[in-house]
Design a protein with these regions (language model features):
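Nucleotidyltransferase catalytic core that binds NTPs
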Residues: 1-154
């Protein structure tokens, strides 16, 4: 496996908290693949194309970052792209518990792929895509939490 990492999520939308994790991870890896996964437990408000466009615009022309969309297991996609690492952000103890459980399952499914946990910066630890979506849907100011404009709601 190369020094390639995958940062996977639904990113609906991609927040400044996600940007913080990428900023911290960039010096650690030769390449980071931001992978937009289809989460069947979530109803996506924004299309995959919108999310890809927002993220690509944020990171152009950084040669160390690639953006892709995928379906299926994250570890299977990691194997397909030759990534040896999964990046996961941690905001709180609940995130740690969930990520630890996912780590245990992923290790059984793909023993060669390691998980790197990166804590959120304190000022961004409360930021989540769910929070941003709620603010956006209520037509409240979401701009402190994302680096781009979301589409207007009719």
């Amino acid at each position: 496996m190369n020094n390639i990492a995958v940062f996977a999520g639904s990113f609906s939308p991609f927040t400044k908290g996600h940007e913080d994790i990428i900023r911290k991870a960039l010096p650690l890896f030769d390449k980071i693949i931001i992978a937009i996964g289809q989460n069947y437990n979530k109803k996506d408000v924004f299309s995959v194309e919108q999310r890809m466009n927002w993220i690509q615009t944020l990171y152009q022309p950084n040669p160390k970052i690639e953006v892709l969309a995928y379906e299926g297991l994250t570890v299977d996609m990691c194997k397909k792209v030759g990534a040896g690492y999964l990046i996961r952000g941690l905001r709180n103890a609940a995130d740690f518990q969930m990520e630890h459980e996912m780590y245990l399952i992923n290790k059984q499914l793909a023993p060669d792929i390691d998980t790197v946990l990166i804590p959120a910066s304190p000022q961004l630890a409360a930021v989540s895509s769910s929070l941003v979506r709620e603010l956006w849907q209520l037509k409240a100011d979401y701009t402190p939490f994302v680096s781009y404009k979301l589409p207007d709601i009719e």
